[in-house]
């Protein structure tokens, strides 16, 4: 069996981890990932190394029983333990999560996004189409079920464990990139009820009730996330995350206090993982 079989087995690993049409089973997911790696599928081999916190050279890749050895080194109980969550602000509700992603996971996600990012888009409130707009000048890459992996699935699971926001409510995650001068000007993440372009999305997919941003690197300057109505901004360390509710806790209505911006980067290149969460289970895409 070759790469084709390995790719199919790796897809089964993702489905097992995410609980698609079955209960989530991370032990089975790791076992399937090992099988995929043994079939020669490089992405599965890389994911095992990331989950085990190992660096592989040519000699290591040639070793007998390497992939099972790596799997035994994965601290699955630790990875499936909720990361610490600390409240940073009450209105709007903002929390900081320590170590949502490991350093190896951050590097993997940057590499995964680097070859795929394209100009970021915003939703047009009149048409519902996603369009390029000067309000957002960075780049983004989305990863639906067809091209997600166990590293992305683990960030979603760890967010669920910390916050109670179920994996199946989470949209496809996006890796974001901002180079010098690029920014995301003041905006809201919620969908405005009654707007013709958004109402169908609200009716079918629900409101975007929460946003989680995970910092993937720190070799840049500027680029803080600023909440303009409360005069508060934040920038996390690699692997740390910020979770905020886009709706009021009292009545679940859109919260105008969440007006926020990604400030311009002044040196280097900023990488983030963005995760939006809806108020209901999402279609499988």
State where each predicted segment sits.
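A conserved position within tetratricopeptide repeats
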Residues: 1-2, 37
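Fe(II)/2-oxoglutarate oxygenase catalytic core
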Residues: 11-18, 24-243, 247-285
């Amino acid at each position: 069996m070759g790469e084709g079989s390995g790719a199919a087995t790796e897809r089964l690993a993702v489905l097992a981890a995410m609980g698609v049409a079955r209960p989530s089973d991370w032990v089975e997911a790791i076992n399937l990932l090992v099988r995929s790696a043994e079939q020669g599928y490089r992405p599965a081999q890389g994911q095992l190394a990331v989950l085990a916190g190992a660096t592989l050279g040519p000699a290591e890749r040639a070793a007998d029983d390497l992939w099972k050895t790596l799997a035994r080194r994965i601290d699955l109980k630790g990875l499936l333990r909720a990361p610490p969550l600390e409240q940073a602000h009450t209105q709007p509700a903002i929390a900081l999560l320590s170590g949502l992603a490991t350093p190896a996971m951050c590097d993997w996600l940057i590499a995964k996004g680097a070859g795929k990012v394209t100009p970021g888009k915003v939703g047009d409130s009149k048409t519902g189409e996603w369009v390029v707009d000067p309000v957002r000048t960075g780049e983004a890459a989305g990863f639906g079920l067809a091209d997600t992996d166990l590293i992305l699935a683990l960030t979603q699971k760890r967010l669920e464990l910390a916050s109670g926001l179920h994996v199946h409510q989470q949209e496809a995650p996006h890796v974001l990139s901002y180079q010098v001068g690029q920014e995301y000007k003041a905006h809201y993440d919620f969908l405005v009820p009654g707007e013709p372009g958004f109402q169908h999305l609200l009716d079918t997919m629900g409101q975007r009730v929460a946003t989680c941003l995970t910092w993937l690197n720190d070799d840049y300057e500027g680029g803080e996330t600023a909440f303009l109505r409360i005069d508060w901004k934040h920038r996390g360390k690699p692997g740390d995350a910020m979770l905020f509710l886009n709706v009021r806790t009292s009545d679940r209505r859109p919260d105008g206090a969440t007006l926020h911006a990604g400030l311009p980067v002044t040196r280097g290149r900023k990488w983030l993982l963005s995760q939006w969460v809806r108020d209901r289970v999402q279609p499988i895409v």
